[in-house]
Amino acid sequence: MTTFSPIPDSFIVNNNCIIKSNPKYDVLTYQQLLDLKKLTPENLKKEWDKMIKAPSDKNRRTFVGNKILYHFQFEELLKTKRDIKDYKTIDEILSNKELSKKWIDYAIKLNRNIKKPYLTSVDIFECYRLCKGSVVFFKPFTTKYLCTHFKATAVLDPCAGWGGRLLGARSLGLEYTGIDTNINLKKNYDKMLELYGGTMLYENCLESDFSTINYDIVITSPPYLNIEQYSHMPLFQSESDYYKDFLIPLIKQC
């Protein structure tokens, strides 16, 4: 006999969560999904303390710091589409009754957490990205480890993305300069810079003057063709164009 976990006090049945055994299909919303990834100031500080204290002598399998990235950049991440036929964003799914019902039913069938009798919009998101793939973060700890291993003092990140490398570098107190064309990220990057430090430039990295930037290591995660389609970034017309006009010039410039 399965012993079910209690529903947390913060979840109200048929308000922000639904019961698997008797689901209501008009309850879960996109805004709930965004809200569930937000941290209180106290929890934000706890996550940052974990990031600072995480030992970086070995490249451990850890997602420390990811909750901070979800807190700040989740909404823009959810707007990013993948180059998959009929790909829908989670906002499009939860805003469409037919699609929402389809994925709620599938999440119930998948039943990833048997002991949990309820579903939230996060469960629908996790189910969808498990099936369709998802846009993911560069783990902050990976940057922390690389900087420790190579004894870096200043990081250049010409394709800054969601902020994982900023967190990794700043958790060691290192200088960090990130570059990105996605101006939609600026509002929440400004909040991150205020808390953790670092510098962000919103421009095409191929047009940046790297000679004016202090760095002794480059750690970045450039887009690969059009697999992930970001705001304010034109699509590459071909694989040849991607290498010839973007990746190779970027590597040479670094």
Indicate where each model-derived feature is located:
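Intrinsic structural disorder/low-complexity segments
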Residues: 74-76
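Class I S-adenosyl-L-methionine-dependent methyltransferase catalytic core
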Residues: 1-67, 79-254
